[in-house]
Each structure stands twice: as structure tokens, then as C-alpha cells.
Regions:
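Adenine nucleotide-associated cytosolic modules
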Residues: 1-186
């Protein structure tokens, strides 16, 4: 048994799941052993990732790697919101999409990719643009919003919905060789 796996499972080959929906099962302990053994992280933090619901707005240049890392890290529920379709010119930087996805909605392509990477998560694709008619409904059931869009209209709307619902918001932006990241923790 790998040393990190042994430490994550407390040296046991199998960890019983006593029917608790809050405990990690053996598969999770093995898959996420490298997280679990990090000082200050442990099984509780991994369980919290598994139980979290994240809304990712945008499955393009920034959303693509974000979605891959969230699924690999063990986030349990991802909602992927994007109204665009995969274009061949996207493929060199939007690494979540494949040649076979050209012409498909990015939200659906990304959903398929994260489920291939981690078949134990729940992923929902919403082929739509964040708008005044759907923002609050989309945001309200999530623990975190990640705004990976490239326009101010959507960014302001995501920020307003986060403030109204009290949902933490992280927005990122990239342009050529530069990037910015901001975290908004709303306390109502």
C-alpha cells in the first residue's frame, strides 16, 4: 500500500462506511490520499469538498481548467453554465473540449469531460447565459460561484446574485499574459 494511502486510511486496507452520508468511503480515501495527508486538510476537508455544490459560469479559456481541477479535487456537484458552442479555434486553450466536441454546446462538452475524469461527481450542464431571469435560481442552491466569463454584464450580474443570496463569489479573468482573481465573501 502506498505510504500516503496508508496514512489517509490509517493503515487499513478498507474503511467501513457505517451508513453515514458524511463519512468518506474507501474509494475516496484512496483517490484523494494526497489531499487527505496534507497538514491541516484531512478527511473532514475532503468530505466538505465532496459535499459542496459549485456553479461555474463559463466553460471557455478560464472555466476549462477550473472545471478539470474541481472535478479532480473531488468537488461533489458541479453546475456548468455556458451558452456558447465549441469552435475549432477554442481547442488550443480550452483544454476541456476535444475535436469531437466542435459544434456542441460548451456546457455539455464540459459536463462529459468532468464526468470522464471523475465518474463519482454529479455534473449538470445548463446551456444558457446568466441573465436577470435565471441568476437567482441558478445561484441559490450553490455553496460557491466561480465566474469565469469574459464580459462585465455577466460579471456584474453574478456579483449581484452572490450578494442577494449570500453566496461566496470568485471571479477570474485572463487576457494575453495577465490574469486577475478576486474573492467576494458576502456577509448578510
Amino acid at each position: 500500500m502506498d505510504d500516503a494511502v496508508s496514512r489517509a486510511t490509517n493503515g487499513h486496507d478498507a474503511v467501513e462506511d457505517m451508513g453515514s452520508t458524511t463519512s468518506l468511503i474507501n474509494r475516496d480515501l484512496i483517490r484523494y490520499a494526497r489531499h487527505i495527508v496534507l497538514p491541516g486538510f484531512g478527511q473532514e476537508a475532503q468530505r466538505r469538498l465532496r459535499d459542496s455544490r459549485v456553479l461555474v459560469v463559463g466553460a471557455g479559456g478560464l472555466g476549462s481548467p477550473v472545471l478539470l481541477y474541481l472535478s479532480a479535487a473531488g468537488v461533489g456537484y458541479l453546475t456548468i453554465l455556458d451558452d456558447d458552442v465549441v469552435d475549432e479555434s477554442n481547442l488550443q486553450r480550452q483544454v476541456i473540449h476535444r475535436q469531437a466536441d466542435v459544434g456542441r454546446p460548451k456546457a455539455l462538452s464540459a459536463k462529459d469531460a468532468v464526468q470522464r475524469l471523475n465518474p463519482h461527481l454529479v455534473a449538470e450542464a445548463v446551456v444558457a447565459r446568466l441573465g436577470t431571469g435565471n441568476a437567482l435560481d441558478l445561484v441559490k442552491d450553490h455553496d460557491l460561484i466561480l465566474d469565469c466569463t469574459d464580459n462585465f454584464t455577466t460579471r456584474y450580474l453574478a456579483s449581484d446574485a452572490a450578494e442577494i443570496t449570500g453566496t461566496p463569489l470568485v471571479w477570474g479573468t485572463i487576457l494575453q499574459y495577465q490574469g486577475q482573481l478576486s474573492l467576494s465573501l458576502i456577509h448578510i
